[in-house]
Amino acid sequence: MAKKKTKFMCQECGYESAKWMGKCPGCQSWNSMVEEFTEVKAKSSRSYVTSGAGIAKPQPITKVEREQEPRIDTSMKELNRVLGGGIVPGSLVLVGGDPGIGKSTLLLQLSARLADLKQRVLYISGEESVKQTKIRSDRLGVLSDHLYVLAETDMEKIEQAIGEVDPTLVIIDSIQTVYQDEITSAPGSVAQVRECTASFMRIAKTTGVAIFIVGHVTKQGAIAGPKLLEHMVDSVLYFEGERHHTYRILRAVKNRFGSTNEMGIFEMKESGLEEVANPSEIFLEDRSSGVAGSTVVASMEGTRPVLVELQALISPTSFGNPRRMATGVDHNRISLLMAVLEKRVGMLLQNQDAYVNVAGGVRLDEPAIDLGIAVSIASSFRNQHTNPHEVVIGEIGLTGEVRRVSRIDQRVNEAAKLGFKRVIIPDKNLGGWTIPSTIEVIGVSTVQDALEVTLGR
């Protein structure tokens, strides 16, 4: 009879300890140790990632035969963009996001697209019955004989079903519901999630089947389970968006087969998710012209420039400590830029509340939007209207200088394509590229220069 053993494991990094500790020594997180019950058995010689039957031997990398397997085209351009050109056969992809954001809808539509291309897809749900999945598929118009559905949570039965169907793609919804009988802990525990993910990795690498697994997120927005889970998979995709907005953004935070800077944008409708071909037009369609505190910035999301409206509201505070609130941008960046404006431009902002928002529910983390934030703050503080036909681009340093940004030609061309008449850029970006004839480009070297150009003083 196997001997039962108790241990404590960190939910964030997987650190193991014989006793409970308030602070994990591995990742320094507090109150993350949970109790796990395991049975001590003989060690398995099975490897999670194998290259086939027999014993693998070291060989020179120059003698390794490279088999160029074509990627699987999903027929969804936004998803292909995020994945780096399509699904890589034998890859394991983790999809995370808030509850109700549309993860299952996205993957069910992906299954339908591949099934329409005569590719076998196995959709395994541990949260819905087969009839409930059918109801959802009818609403989305997903009907194909090449799409197989299964309601199962037992890892052994799931592996058997994959062998019987022999699909091109497998969807697991979700990894927190799958369990292995050999592990005594409950489904969704650290040990179950780790071992089930390792089993799916082994299946993907040995059979060449692409597997997408859905992962729940914590209150902090991170994928639930040990951080080891994200290290094991090939790609990690986050599906995000505001609950009260119809737009959803798919980002890759890890991708072994492509860039991690790409972004795919979808719009949630009654018939499901629809791709947004030109996100700049969508994010600017509700913009009010001739108002104080509004500025348009050009942010690079991977290889695609996106024009987004930045809004700022500056008002006198009635408390001892002024508030600094930001939605869609880093809160600390706002405090830094306000300090630069106060020190280098002479604005008295220490007794002002500041509220900065990115319209459309988008999150921007690129330094090139610094100048746009500064102009919005100054515009609201002085109550001066900004030019509605103007785009502002530039990074701000602590000394008040406007620093060079990358891919300035793509940003300016996108602004010209959408009908903007003027763009403010760093003066160091003025040479080495062709300026469109339909737009005026003005170079500035400091924040003071930028405010004189945009606000007149």
Swiss-Prot record:
DNA-dependent ATPase involved in processing of recombination intermediates, plays a role in repairing DNA breaks. Stimulates the branch migration of RecA-mediated strand transfer reactions, allowing the 3' invading strand to extend heteroduplex DNA faster. Binds ssDNA in the presence of ADP but not other nucleotides, has ATPase activity that is stimulated by ssDNA and various branched DNA structures, but inhibited by SSB. Does not have RecA's homology-searching function. Residues 353-457 are annotated as: Lon-protease-like. HAMAP family: RadA_bact. GO terms for biological process: recombinational repair. Keywords: ATP-binding, DNA damage, DNA repair, DNA-binding, Hydrolase, Metal-binding, Nucleotide-binding, Stress response, Zinc, Zinc-finger. This is DNA repair protein RadA. Belongs to the RecA family. RadA subfamily. A motif (RadA KNRFG motif) lies at residues 254-258. It holds the Pfam family Zn_ribbon_LapB. The keyword DNA repair applies. A zinc finger (C4-type) spans 10-27. It comes from Halalkalibacterium halodurans (strain ATCC BAA-125 / DSM 18197 / FERM 7344 / JCM 9153 / C-125).
